[in-house]
Design a protein with these regions (language model features):
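N-terminal catalytic cores of NTP/NDP-binding nucleotidyl/phosphoryl-transfer enzymes
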Residues: 1-60
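Class I S-adenosyl-L-methionine
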Residues: 30, 61-65, 179-182, 220
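Non-catalytic positions within long, well-ordered alpha-helices that form the structural scaffold/packing
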Residues: 30-31, 65, 92, 96-97
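Receiver (REC) domain switch/active-site residues of two-component response regulators
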Residues: 36, 70, 102
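Acidic, Ser/Thr-rich peripheral helices and adjacent loops at domain boundaries
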Residues: 59-61, 345-346
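Active-site cores that bind ATP or allylic diphosphates and position pyrophosphate for catalysis
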Residues: 74-406
């Protein structure tokens, strides 16, 4: 009797924090694909919009496992604090490097238009005609997101309103996942799931379903008034956050961010998203402003978005430089798993899977080990800031065990 092939489905996420919409997505992903295991690739302690996570990656891993995920792997920092395109590429590369993932599921606002958007984004990013047109928009002073929306409208004939609606974070990431799969020549399927409830940036509920599926943005805003005000999270996830006992903000990291910007002022342009114009702004404003919020607002310009400013600051701190894209993930760090999870068939994978750092870091060498050191440094900075803010003992990456649930 032929042995049935194990079905593994991937999700790329941040869980900042984990909410009911995330639990719904995991359940739908399992249902749509018939998955034996759902594997999550999750940001570490800093997220794609250039901010810190509200709580560390171990707590968020526990939330995800309690919410239905079977395995959680860490997305390396060099991808996690990059553009949507690089974030998506890193996530897909991680799943592909496991050698056993059949499909990637993601939430989006318009599943029916993801293929069209992916083709058009490919054109504007990788074909000469599209690249030249985008340069023309940039010369007119348009930011990259605004230029891409204009390009989308011209190529599809959609109305300005429809294009604006389609340029939502879930749709953009979905299109980028498609492109990453194409770039890697992967056979992984894309399975878009319609986003339910609040929009990505929405803070105030407007319809009944919004109360059930609140956005992470809304939950973070609720947290301003304490845990008692938080709605929209599974009880187990909220309890894990309460037990952690803290919620971090990016301004908590301002002293170390400001120090990095000053110390590295002569080599700012070597970092990934720091153009000569942005480097000049950083060098000027770091001498004039005294707090994080004032600094990022002073650095935002007509054609440089706030998200890019915030990402660039973190890239300076963690020394993330512009490099050729990897075609293999040099390592994958497993943050946690369920006890009863279906074993992953990793026989086709050439990527070392690292569990406990103290035991397995030595499996890497050279530049691969340096890349892992970058992730460890990011975690150390986060743990240090938590300890300074709360008085809690500082976590040590080398003493952290995998999170096991179930």
């Amino acid at each position: 009797m032929e042995k049935r092939q194990v079905k593994i489905t991937g999700i790329i996420s941040e869980y900042n924090p984990f909410h009911e919409g995330h639990r719904y997505q995991i359940r739908k992903a399992r249902e749509i694909t018939g998955a034996d295991a759902v594997v999550v690739v999750m940001n570490g302690d800093f997220v794609q919009r250039g901010e810190c996570a509200v709580v560390d990656k171990y707590v968020r891993t526990k939330m995800a496992l309690l919410g239905g995920a079977d395995y959680v792997f860490e997305l390396p920092a060099r991808y996690g604090i990059s553009s949507a395109a690089d974030f998506a590429y890193g996530g897909i590369l991680a799943l592909e490097s496991l050698g056993c993932v059949d499909a990637v599921c993601f939430g989006c606002e318009a599943p029916e238009d993801i293929d069209t958007m992916a083709d058009i984004f490919w054109n504007c990013q990788r074909e000469e005609e599209g690249i030249m047109q985008m340069k023309g928009y940039a010369a007119q002073g348009l930011s990259y997101p605004a230029a891409r929306q204009r390009f989308l409208q011209e190529k599809t004939g959609w109305s300005e309103e429809k294009c604006r609606e389609r340029m939502q974070p879930g749709n953009i990431l979905g299109a980028e996942y498609r492109q990453a799969i194409r770039l890697l020549g992967s056979s992984m399927r894309c399975e878009p799931i319609l986003r339910e409830g609040m929009g990505y940036h929405q803070v105030t509920p407007e319809k009944e379903n919004d109360w059930k599926y609140m956005s992470a943005t809304a939950i973070r805003a609720q947290m301003e008034n304490g845990f008692e005000q938080v709605k929209g999270m599974p009880e187990e996830a909220l309890q894990a956050w309460k037990e952690a006992g803290y919620s971090m903000k990016t301004e908590d990291f301002w002293p170390v961010l400001a120090l990095a910007l000053r110390l590295r002022k002569d080599k700012l342009v070597s970092y990934k998203d720091v153009s000569e114009d942005l480097a000049a702004v950083f060098s000027r404003e770091i001498l004039q402003v005294a707090d994080y919020e004032s600094f990022i607002h002073a650095c935002k310009t007509k054609n440089i978005t706030m998200a890019r400013v915030k990402r660039a600051i973190l890239q300076v701190l963690f020394e993330v430089k512009a490099e050729e894209r990897e075609t293999r993930m040099p390592y994958l760090r497993m943050l946690g798993r369920r006890k009863d999870a279906c074993p992953l068939p990793l026989g086709n994978s050439e990527t070392p899977v690292i569990g406990r750092l103290a035991k397995e870091e030595e499996r890497l060498s050279g530049s691969d080990k340096e890349k892992l050191a970058q992730d460890i440094f990011a975690a150390d900075i986060y743990h240090m800031a938590v300890a300074q803010k709360t008085g809690l003992p500082q976590k040590n990456e080398y003493k952290q065990s995998m999170v096991i649930v179930g």
